């Protein structure tokens, strides 16, 4: 699923050549062509440090570590984004399924998907996010 046919315009304009230079091949494929990293291989799947997870493309803060939980799915999981304005959701019909794709609302980078099987005592949602789409910024006490 490529973003090439999308009609939404995002505030941050990405230069493809610059992205190819700056991102790893996996980061590029995940964020620009909606690829999925293999389960249990991502850098942030088991990370428990206190901090903020940001978009690897535009550095927009997306998720707080306090919203992260162990879902057992093999990808970092969060029960809510930082706020309601940082995430764009779009119906995804790829691979013979109907899912809700999650993108950065600032640059349109593919992040992952959101499912309704998260912690019931929180939001009931599970934002299943590719580590390759994220950068982590630890809070000063973790340095």
Swiss-Prot record:
> Which positions are catalytic residues?
128 (nucleophile)
Q: Where is the MsrB domain?
A: 16-139
Would you say which domain of life the source belongs to? Answer: Bacteria
Q: Which SUPFAM superfamilies match?
A: Mss4-like (SSF51316)
Keywords, A to Z, come to:
Metal-binding, Oxidoreductase, Zinc
Q: Which GO terms describe its molecular function?
A: peptide-methionine (R)-S-oxide reductase activity; zinc ion binding
- EC numbers: 1.8.4.12
Write down the required cofactor(s): Zn(2+)
**Do you know which Pfam families this protein is assigned to?**
SelR (PF01641)
UniProt entry tagged with the keyword NAD? no
Report if keyword Isomerase is assigned. no
The record's Gene Ontology biological-process terms are: protein repair; response to oxidative stress
Q: How is the cofactor bound?
A: Binds 1 zinc ion per subunit. The zinc ion is important for the structural integrity of the protein.
- Which residues are involved in binding Zn(2+)? 55, 58, 104, 107
GO CC aspect terms: cytoplasm
Disulfide linkage: none
Catalysed reaction(s) here are: L-methionyl-[protein] + [thioredoxin]-disulfide + H2O = L-methionyl-(R)-S-oxide-[protein] + [thioredoxin]-dithiol
Q: In which family does this protein belong, per the annotation?
A: Belongs to the MsrB Met sulfoxide reductase family.
Q: Which HAMAP family match?
A: MsrB
Task: Quote the protein name from its UniProt record.
Answer: Peptide methionine sulfoxide reductase MsrB
